[in-house]
Amino acid sequence: MQEYEKSESLYIVLISIHGLIRGHDLELGRDADTGGQTKYVVELAKALAKQPNVEQVDLVTRRIVDVEVGGDYAESVEALAENAQIVRIDAGPEGYIRKEELWDHLDSFADNLLSWLHGQPRWPNVLHSHYADAGYVGVRLSHLTGLPLIHTGHSLGRDKCRRLLARGLTMEEIEQRYHISRRINAEEETLSNADLIITSTGNEIEDQYELYDCYTPEKMAVIPPGTDLDQFHPPAASNASSAFAASLKNFLSQPDMPMILALSRPDERKNIVTLLEAYGESPRLQAKANLVIVAGNRDDIREMDDGAQGVLTELLLVMDCYDLYGRVALPKHHKADDVADIYRLAAASKGCLLIPL
């Protein structure tokens, strides 16, 4: 067991393995693995680094060498903010793979991360894992080093399995597609070994973690996600001239009508196809408001993964079936920094926001 230096200034290691993580222009919605968790961990690292008792924050993820996703993700170290950086660790194939295919490579990730930690000037005070795959790694590192482990689940396998079964999928289908048993086993192990579990809501503790054999509510604490008030603020007159607002004019016959906004990645679990069908079934709603669905970023749907391709194709088919041209916008691109403007645009239109779950 490694002895680590006790210091008043904290060195925190965040572990978030899957998806595309970088310090600028986050590609949120590019695929099912690059969503809210990506934004969360990057902002968390920056916020922690600003704390007066924090000396260093390292956000550790998987290094990806793949021309299909770009060179940023191949950099071993990327400066994130003062006292914060992204560290990328090799594990498994060089190319980008979805999180369900990472399980066989997590032991390698843990070994390589441990080697990297041994080469640093000081030992961390705490490990903070994010999602089941990082929890698997965090448990092993905690056992090897004696470091305390904090864990944030973000989403949970047992809850997901329950929802998929309710939609009519069989356990065999769920296992084949999501390797759900490996995920749930990792979550049970993490719950059993972590010193602290962070959740966003009390519901997460009472209704989701309660499904687990290793349910330990006394080790759980609710820390609601924060809001960047410099970015998220009420709409101003200048908001109407934003680039995103201009792009909607290519889709909408009456762009000044109230907006029903849905923003999510193109994932079948988000149920945005049903939203479009409901809008298509309601001429009264169509007369009152436009529907704007911001479903990630796309260049060529034919080159996207099967899940995103299926959702986007179905959206276009439903849009055509109900002849919703001029009433529905499905913009192809937006930047992460556009999200606040998109929300303000919906508010300024006196529309509403739907949260696909």
Region roles according to the model:
Residues 1-357:
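Catalytic cores of nucleotide-sugar-dependent glycosyltransferases that transfer UDP/GDP/TDP-activated
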